[in-house]
Swiss-Prot record:
The lineage of its organism: Eukaryota, Fungi, Dikarya, Ascomycota, Saccharomycotina. Ypt/Rab-type GTPases are key regulators of membrane trafficking and intracellular vesicular transport. They act as molecular switches that convert between GTP-bound and GDP-bound states, and regulate virtually all steps of membrane traffic from the formation of the transport vesicle at the donor membrane to its fusion at the target membrane. In the GDP-bound state, Ypt proteins are predominantly cytosolic, solubilized through the interaction with a GDP dissociation inhibitor (GDI). Changing residue 159 to P: Reduced nucleotide affinity leading to increased turnover between GDP- and GTP-bound states without the need of a guanine nucleotide-exchange factor. Suppresses the zinc, caffeine and calcium sensitivity of CCZ1 mutants. Belongs to the small GTPase superfamily. Rab family. It comes from Saccharomyces cerevisiae (strain ATCC 204508 / S288c). A lipid is attached at residues 206, 208 (S-geranylgeranyl cysteine). This is Ypt/Rab-type GTPase YPT7. GTP binds at residues 17-23, 33-40, 67, 126-129, 158-160. It comes from the Eukaryota. The gene is YPT7. Transmembrane segments: none annotated. Its main location: other.
């Protein structure tokens, strides 16, 4: 029997409507692709068992959130408790790339993370299967953005052709697990501090 601890990792996928968030989620979890997905209202999630670095077992919840502005307010309620945030843009859509920083900032405002400076993000430039003439966002521009936001890992992907999706989500799982463990340790430290303060108070309040 394995003694390995199983963790539940929550991963949020953000980005403009139509960049391929739902397609990426289904490609990774189910290894399937469809062009018939409807716009996500609020949020939806799928789960997948993952093994990180060969010996760490976890259940990853991949949350797909609304990209359309009229549905965004429904999705922010699901940001809290996230262990990693994936920011997706479409390499054929300049505005979706320009909005990456806004999505990151919105997440940090609503997610209430313990340490915004160190919280893990991953950027995915999707639809690299598109014809070269239709690609607008260069890899260099994406690398510069990723660096400016704190050296965020960047992957160019194709949900349609299953390019780089598994590799990207391996990094996402690793980052999420590290964040999950850091949050757990911080909670345990705070809990132990609270217990020690209470015990010290009881010891100092003796009756004379």
């Amino acid at each position: 029997m394995s003694s390995r601890k199983k963790n539940i990792l929550k991963v949020i996928i953000l980005g403009d409507s139509g960049v391929g968030k739902t397609s990426l989620m289904h490609r990774y979890v189910n290894d399937k692709y469809s062009q018939q997905y409807k716009a996500t209202i609020g949020a939806d999630f799928l789960t997948k068992e993952v093994t990180v670095d060969g010996d760490k077992v976890a259940t990853m919840q991949v949350w797909d959130t609304a990209g359309q502005e009229r549905f965004q307010s429904l999705g922010v309620a699901f940001y809290r408790g996230a262990d990693c945030c994936v920011l997706v843009y479409d390499v054929t859509n300049a505005s979706s790339f320009e909005n990456i920083k806004s999505w990151r900032d919105e997440f940090l405002v609503h997610a209430n993370v313990n340490s915004p400076e160190t919280f893990p993000f991953v950027i995915l430039g999707n639809k690299i299967d598109a014809e070269e003439s239709k690609k607008i966002v260069s890899e260099k521009s994406a690398q510069e953005l990723a660096k400016s936001l704190g050296d965020i890992p960047l992957f160019l992907t194709s949900a349609k052709n299953a390019i780089n999706v598994d590799t990207a989500f391996e990094e996402i799982a690793r980052s999420a697990l590290q964040q999950n463990q850091a949050d757990t340790e911080a909670f345990e430290d705070d809990y132990n501090d609270a217990i020690n303060i209470r015990l010290d108070g009881e010891n100092n309040s003796c009756s004379c």
